[in-house]
């Protein structure tokens, strides 16, 4: 079946909130923040 993931992140410089991102199978989420040195990958396979 299809697996869904929710990713919430705060980008300090932009004060931007990324929320409720739904990804389908075979997709992945890549988030990077140079300021925070944060890298997150969410495989949905």
UniProtKB/Swiss-Prot annotation:
Key words, A-Z: Carbohydrate metabolism, Extracellular matrix, Glycosidase, Hydrolase, Multifunctional enzyme, Polysaccharide degradation, Secreted, Xylan degradation
Similarity annotation: Belongs to the glycoside hydrolase 3 family.
Listed GO CC annotations: extracellular region
Tissue: Strongly expressed in young roots, significantly reduced expression in older roots. Highest expression levels seen in root tips, some expression seen in root nodules and in the flowers, but not seen in other aerial parts of the plant such as in the stems, hypocotyls or leaves.
Domain of life from the UniProt record: Eukaryota
Main subcellular location of this protein, as a coarse class: secreted
Job of this protein: A bifunctional beta-xylosidase/alpha-L-arabinosidase, exo-enzyme that acts synergistically with endohydrolases. Releases xylose and arabinose from cell walls.
One GO BP: xylan catabolic process
UniProt catalytic activity: Hydrolysis of (1->4)-beta-D-xylans, to remove successive D-xylose residues from the non-reducing termini; Hydrolysis of terminal non-reducing alpha-L-arabinofuranoside residues in alpha-L-arabinosides
Subcellular location: Secreted, Extracellular space, Extracellular matrix
Enzyme Commission numbers on file: 3.2.1.37, 3.2.1.55
GO molecular function, one term: xylan 1,4-beta-xylosidase activity
This protein's name: Beta-xylosidase/alpha-L-arabinofuranosidase 1
């Amino acid at each position: 079946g299809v697996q869904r993931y929710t990713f919430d992140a705060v980008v300090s410089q932009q004060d931007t909130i990324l929320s409720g991102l739904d990804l389908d199978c075979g997709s992945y989420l890549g988030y990077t923040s140079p300021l925070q040195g944060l890298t997150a990958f969410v495989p949905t396979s």
